[in-house]
Each structure stands twice: as C-alpha cells, then as structure tokens.
Amino acid sequence: MKNSIEIEIPEMGKIKFESLRDTNKKSKNIPIKNSKYIKTISYNELEKYLNNEYILSLLKKRNKIRVFESKAINMISRYRYDVFVKYYYVQSYITKTNYKLAKEIYLEHIKSFNNFSEPDGRKEKPEDFINNFNKLIKNIQKDGIDKTIIPITKNGEIIDGAHRLAIALYFNLKVPFVMFDLLDANYNKQFFINRGFNEKYAKIIDKEIVEKNNYNIDLEGIKKWRKKIIQKYLWYCVP
C-alpha cells in the first residue's frame, strides 16, 4: 500500500490519506489499548452493523471479520478533532447547558467538514444532522452501542462513527470495532480551521473538552481527561 494518497470525496474535495500514529494508540497488534476480542462475524453481518453503503464500499471484503471492543476513551485521537466537538454537543444536549452555543459549534464544524452533505445521501441539510444526532443520542442512552460496530484503520483511527464514539465517550461505554487495512485521514483541529471552522469555537472546545489550548493530546492529558470523565459518569449515575 502507498504511504499516502489523495482521494476526491463528494462535498469534501481532495482529502489526503496517510499512515498516522497517535500517542494514545499501541504500535503493534491491535492498535486500541485494553481491547478484547468478542466475536467473529461474516461480511454480510458487518453490512447490517455498519448500515452505511458508502463506507462499506471502501472496506475490503473478507469472509470472516473479528470484532473487538474497548472503552471509548481508548479510541480518541488528535487526528479526529471532530469527536471532541461532537462530545461537547452531547454534553450540552444531555445536561441542557449551553445548548444553543453547542449547536452553533456543531453545525459550524459539519459545514467545514462536508457542507451538510454526506456521500450516502441520507443527510443533506443542517436539520438532518441535528435530528439524526439527537435521535442517536437518545437511542444509545437507552439501548447502548452494541447494535453497531465502528470500523477503524490498522493504526486505530476511526473510518466512520465519530458521532457514536462521542456519545459512547460521554456515557463511558465500551465500543465494538473492526480493523481494516486502510490509510488514515488527518481530521485534526487545523484541518477544520483551514476549511472555515471559527477559531473562537476551537478555543471553546480546547478549554471545555480537550483542556489544552494548543490541543496537544499526550498520555498525561489522556489520563487526566479519563479521570474526569469517569468522575462525571459516576455522578450522572447517582439517583
């Protein structure tokens, strides 16, 4: 496989894919830390779990696919800044705090990402994204995330499922995932800013979610954030 390649994606333009390594990921074997094998499924079953024909078309067909799971905190990455934006929305939606601002930031980052249009055609305007996300939050809050699977690259970067990962992160859930030999896309903070995401919104996300103004996620930062999330989760569960 080539070290890097540019692919034209509808509504997004040319996106560079390369081999990336985040400090939150392992360098050998299963890239997601503290992962556990849970089952093997067929390619047809994967289609049901993904429910996204466009993403499925990118994945190499295999007869048997091994499914693993790990805590959502182990799957975050500096290369997926959008997960933190989505987390801020989930937090505001659930707690009913700063929701108007969170909605503005969420829609701004979606606009800079794909201009409110996804390759599978299921979401084509801002209201579609808001309604779909709200429904997803309610469903996962009620039923968990076991009915879906998130595909990742061999380096541990998610290929699809940023909304689901953000919700799982908020509720401290374990996330089922499968690995595919694909290159990684660098959707870091600068990616969004370069495409029009307002820097004042980025500063809010850095302060409220990432807790590092320069957004340099390191192992110590991950540990501190994990502790805070677990504390919040325990508080949320107390009747």
Task: Annotate each predicted stretch with a short phrase.
Residues 31, 39, 43-60, 208-212, ...:
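Periplasmic/luminal catalytic loop of GT-C fold multi-pass membrane glycosyltransferases
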Residues 55-116:
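Extended, charge-rich helix/loop segments that form flexible
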Residues 101-157:
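Short alpha-helix boundary/capping and kink motifs at helix termini
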Residues 2, 9, 30, 40-44, ...:
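Short linear elements at protein peripheries
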Residues 155-172:
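A sequence-level detector for short glycine-anchored, His/Arg-bearing signature motifs
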